[in-house]
């Protein structure tokens, strides 16, 4: 990848945020991505667009030729248990986690690449609902003993539900 492309949604989200820490993180993102590419032996490709609000997510190629995904995100509470949850699902309806790192204001995940056929947003809403319900049934499992996952009821209370 020549130069670093930033996803539009990430830029918009940071620009709307009054947190100077997030703006500093976005300014440091090119160096963060370079560090992760060196650390894990990756060649970065163009990020997925429009992207998310908290992370740079894009396809990468490992030195051994594997096609993976790098997710480098702003460190926030919702991201803290993402790798643990993916490992708990153990590739049953979720991608594999190959590596993770947390440093400064960054959480980084090296993930298996999942190449969908049709983006869900391109199908009628009733079909979207059916896919999501099927996936949720497939993903549900009891958390491991001693887990640190937040309880959904607590999240709902925190957002006023």
Each model region followed by its residue ranges:
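Juxta-kinase regulatory segment immediately upstream of eukaryotic protein kinase catalytic domains
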Residues: 1-45
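A conserved alpha-helical element in kinase catalytic cores
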Residues: 26-30, 54-55, 64-110, 114, ...
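Short strand-coil-strand connectors
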Residues: 38, 63-64
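Protein kinase glycine-rich loop
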Residues: 46-51
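Active-site catalytic-loop/activation-segment of kinase and kinase-like phosphoryl-transfer enzymes
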Residues: 135, 148-161
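Protein kinase catalytic-loop region centered on the HRD/HxD motif
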Residues: 142
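Short, non-ligating residues that shape and space the ligands of small metal-coordination modules
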Residues: 145
């Amino acid at each position: 990848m020549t130069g670093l492309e930033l996803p539009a949604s990430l830029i918009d989200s940071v620009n709307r945020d009054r947190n100077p820490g997030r703006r500093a993180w976005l300014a440091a993102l090119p160096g963060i991505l370079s560090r992760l590419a060196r650390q894990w032996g990756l060649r970065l490709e163009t990020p997925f667009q429009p992207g998310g609000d908290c992370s740079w997510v894009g396809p990468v190629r490992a030195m051994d030729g594997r096609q993976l995904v790098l997710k480098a995100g702003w460190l926030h509470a919702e991201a803290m248990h993402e790798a643990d949850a993916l490992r708990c699902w153990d590739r049953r309806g979720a991608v594999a986690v190959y590596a993770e790192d947390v440093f400064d204001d960054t959480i980084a995940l090296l993930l298996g690449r999942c190449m969908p056929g049709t983006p869900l947003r391109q199908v009628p809403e009733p079909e979207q609902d059916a896919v999501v319900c099927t996936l949720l049934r497939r993903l549900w499992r009891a958390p491991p003993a001693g887990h640190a996952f937040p309880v959904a009821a607590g999240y709902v209370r925190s957002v006023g539900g």
